[in-house]
A protein has these predicted regions:
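Short, well-ordered alpha-helical segments in soluble proteins
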Residues: 118, 136, 140-144, 159-162, ...
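Hydrophobic, well-ordered secondary-structure segments
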Residues: 111, 115, 129, 133, ...
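Anion-binding (especially nucleotide phosphate/pyrophosphate-binding) glycine-rich loop
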Residues: 2-136, 146
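Glycine-centered flexibility sites
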Residues: 33-34, 65-67, 76-79, 108, ...
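Phosphate/pyrophosphate- and phosphate-bearing ligand-binding catalytic cores of soluble enzymes
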Residues: 18-20, 26-28, 32, 70, ...
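Basic, gly/Ser/Thr/Pro-rich low-complexity segments located predominantly at protein N termini
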Residues: 38-39, 70-72, 113, 136-143, ...
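A detector of low-complexity, intrinsically disordered, Ser/Thr/Gly/Pro/Ala-rich segments
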Residues: 1, 5-7, 195, 200
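Structural signature of FAD isoalloxazine-binding scaffolds in flavoprotein oxidoreductases
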Residues: 33, 41-45, 71-89, 141-172, ...
Length: 323
């Protein structure tokens, strides 16, 4: 960012960090991919509101948390990326007379932190969030789940922000919620970018959620979290850059089983490989390009389709231009 942009930004009361031509590999868990034309790390929600209000009409915008389900293609992203992880990290707990309660968490809070906060406050049902490698915002956007739990099972209400910086409170009835899918009912458009449906007038992003949880035994919850994390460590390639599960599980089956049955475990292209530990993971073994990862995704989809007649659907958001 040059001095004139910095001066203009401060003149509008903005307090965050604006960067140009930012390598998105620094901000996604795959540690691969192209650059974004512009990124902004707001100081807080108020700062994000001001920044959105100042953007030109039609400017493509993406919100990114920990980047755990995201890949920016090597040709880069001609858009503005707003980072939520350091700005939207507030958490509050309110208890009810029956021992249950609610957790309010902003979109940039890591999902495992919410699981720990719930356990510390004797609230049950959020333990599975410890196994989701991303933020609450990302979990809301795709109804992330694991180990028998799904994010929207817990949601009492959410707060969203749109392109004009307008904040709204919405409840689950405003959305069609399914397996790894959340679509706002009123316009039948995705509430998040990345599904191929983009409309500047209707686009909204989650900035917080209120989760309603029953009373539980904190010690049991902590033991459950520990067991889930041990299970995750044993089954998943956590020591190398990855984006978690790459494909949704088809009805009645598992993507990992199908990919492994096609003999693709360990298959490598460039610096990326289908994990030898878990076939629904693609890992960066060193110097992977986004094109390597996408090629492996296409290979797995083609192989499973040809052998089983099943079309694997991606859980990963692919954005940007091919080089």
């Amino acid at each position: 960012m040059d001095m004139s942009e910095q001066t203009q930004m401060r003149g509008h009361g903005l307090r965050g960090e604006l960067r140009s031509d930012e390598p998105m590999a620094r901000h996604v868990s795959w540690r691969a991919g192209g650059r974004a034309r512009r990124t902004y790390a707001p100081a807080d929600l108020e700062d994000m509101v001001l920044f959105l209000r100042g953007l030109p009409d039609g400017e493509p915008v993406y919100l990114v948390g920990l980047g755990s389900n995201l890949l920016v293609r090597d040709g880069g992203l001609d858009a503005t990326v707003i980072f939520t992880h350091w700005a939207l990290r507030g958490v509050r707990v309110s208890k009810a007379a029956d021992g249950g309660g609610e957790i309010w968490a902003q979109a940039g809070v890591a999902s495992p932190k919410v699981a720990r906060v719930a356990a510390l406050n004797d609230l049950a049902g959020a333990e599975f969030l410890a196994g989701i490698p991303g933020t609450i915002g990302g979990a809301l956007a795709m109804n992330a789940g694991c180990y028998g739990g799904e994010t929207w099972d817990l949601v009492a209400q959410v707060e969203t922000i749109d392109r004009t910086g307008t904040l709204r409170v919405r409840t689950p009835r405003h959305y069609s919620i399914g397996y790894r899918s959340v679509v706002r009912r009123c316009r039948q458009l995705s509430s998040v970018p990345g599904d191929g449906t983009r409309n500047a007038e209707t686009e909204e992003w989650f900035v917080s959620a209120t989760l309603r949880l029953p009373h539980g035994d904190g010690e049991q919850s902590r033991a459950r979290i520990k067991a889930l994390l041990s299970q995750r460590i044993a089954a998943q390639p956590l020591g190398v850059p990855n984006a978690g599960s790459v494909f949704r599980n088809p009805p009645g089956d598992h993507a990992a089983r199908l990919i492994e049955a096609c003999g693709l475990k360990g298959r490598a292209i460039g610096g990326a490989a289908i994990s030898a530990k878990h076939a629904n993971f693609i890992v960066n073994t060193g110097g992977a390009r986004a094109a390597d990862i996408e090629a492996l995704m296409n290979l797995a989809q083609q192989a499973v389709r040809e052998r089983f007649g099943i079309c694997l659907e991606s859980e990963v958001q692919l954005i940007g231009d091919r080089s």
